[in-house]
Amino acid sequence: MANEEQGSILKALDVAKTQWYHVTAVVVSGMGFFTDSYDLFVISLITKLLGRIYYQVPGSSSPGSLPDGISAAVSGVAFAGTFIGQIFFGCLGDKLGRKRVYGLTLLIMTICSICSGLSLGRDPKTVMVTLCFFRFWLGFGIGGDYPLSATIMSEYSNKRTRGAFIAAVFGMQGIGILAAGAVSLLVSAVFESKFPSRAYILDGAASTVPQADYVWRIILMVGALPALLTYYWRMKMPETARYTALVSKNAEQAALDMTKVLNVDIEASAAKNDQARVSSDEFGLFSMKFLRRHGLHLLGTASTWFLLDIAFYSQNLFQKDIFTTIGWLPSAKTMNAIQELYMIAKAQTIIACCSTVPGYFFTVGFIDYMGRKKIQIMGFAMMTIFMLSLAIPYHHWTLPANRIGFVVLYSFTFFFSNFGPNATTFIVPAEIFPARIRSTCHGISAASGKAGAMVGSFGFSALVKALGMSNTLYIMAGINLLGLLLTFTIPETNGKSLEELSGETEPEKIKEKIVV
């Protein structure tokens, strides 16, 4: 039996039951994040291999390694591209619409993933320059996926489960990290079985077989597959009803799009004077009215994301160095080039399975019950505690009998970053800003995070060399504590509609007839 009710498009979105389309949107948007994290984190697995292939010094007592500057560039150049892409595509998503630029980011990621693996030349300089060039543009495409995926998912979702939906999209980052390790394990195992060689300590020249040059290229190019496979479905997604109604001022089209995907019949009857009232309340980005309403919120989302990413990316990108320092990974001399890649990938995969991935999905399960702010405070607090637990008795953890304990505590920092601020810093900016600048503000917040990632990727190894691992861990603990304090500048968004949070429209401003 059909019941006729007066309501709004926006209210219909907020009260809509979870349907198959929501699940489809999570998968399609999430596969972009799967690709993002695979491409960003896989580089940390292959840098040791690149050093052996291109920077081996004949007769040296230790395997070749990338020079510090080149290592930092290879690890961090994608973040520079991501930083620019987040701001550029964030603004474009508000100007042109979410859908119109959503497919472009995926195409850039696909093309540049392939080109990264096809980096030109054989001499070290040429290979590194072309690799960095394509990884910069890969990062540019990845950057666009952050504000667009978050904004699209928040605008599609109902208010009851919105946090879980956005967290599920972001949770694909964990699956991407896991996949990066798994693919590296598989490729290195296959090549090791087909092209075995002796450990470096036994035969330095022969420990890196010529075929190793194919290994890192294949691993990088695999990142193009998930992006390519979901391109068609991403282009089939309609523009979000919130953007169409509130920004494009086309209530009829918004009603039509909603009718197709959410199983409700809507007759749009929004009058022009209603839409004019919405427009009259508009204010520009960084206007005085924006700063009064949302200035502190933007400061909070940007600063907490910046601090989180310093710790998160330095931990991820340099965990191989940390594990080598404490002796959890064997000495590089005792392995050939492909075996070393295998062992690094194995360590990352274990950490991903035991702490990284579970953390993401704890967030999915609890965020709409606990709220965003509590989870973020808890995450920063626990990361601070575990970092101090590693730093204070650092010498204790370096003893052979205690190394597993170090790895366990280190894993907990990953768990609480993902069941904590790594997820919530992505979610909150997609909820608290008006629709007409939502994508831009999310892009600014995310770009602030990537600035932190660049600080982490370029600065972590320098800090360790200058201050030692123990003092560096103290600094990371301090960064997490500061992130906890700045969390109090953001509002709790749990259980509230996007329009209630942004204050951009009243329920009666856009009226439709809904038949359920």
Swiss-Prot record:
Tissue note: Expressed in anthers, tapetumand mature pollen and, to a lower extent, in hydathodes and vascular tissues of cotyledons of flowering plants.
Localization: Membrane
Topological domain ranges for the Extracellular compartment: 47-71, 122-132, 184-212, 315-349, 396-403, 464-471
Topology feature Cytoplasmic, residues: 2-25, 93-100, 154-162, 234-293, 371-374, 425-442, 493-516
Classification via InterPro entries: MFS_dom (IPR020846), MFS_sugar_transport-like (IPR005828), MFS_trans_sf (IPR036259), Phos_permease (IPR004738), Sugar_transporter_CS (IPR005829)
Membrane topology field: Multi-pass membrane protein
GO CC terms: membrane
Principal localisation: membrane
Keyword Nucleus carried by entry: no
Keyword field: Acetylation, Membrane, Phosphate transport, Symport, Transmembrane, Transmembrane helix, Transport
PROSITE patterns (UniProt xref): MFS, SUGAR_TRANSPORT_1
Family as reported in the entry's similarity comment: Belongs to the major facilitator superfamily. Phosphate:H(+) symporter (TC 2.A.1.9) family.
Function: High-affinity transporter for external inorganic phosphate.
PANTHER family per the UniProt record, alphabetical: SOLUTE CARRIER FAMILY 22 MEMBER
Protein known as: Probable inorganic phosphate transporter 1-6
Species this chain originates from: Arabidopsis thaliana
Lineage: Eukaryota, Viridiplantae, Streptophyta, Embryophyta, Tracheophyta
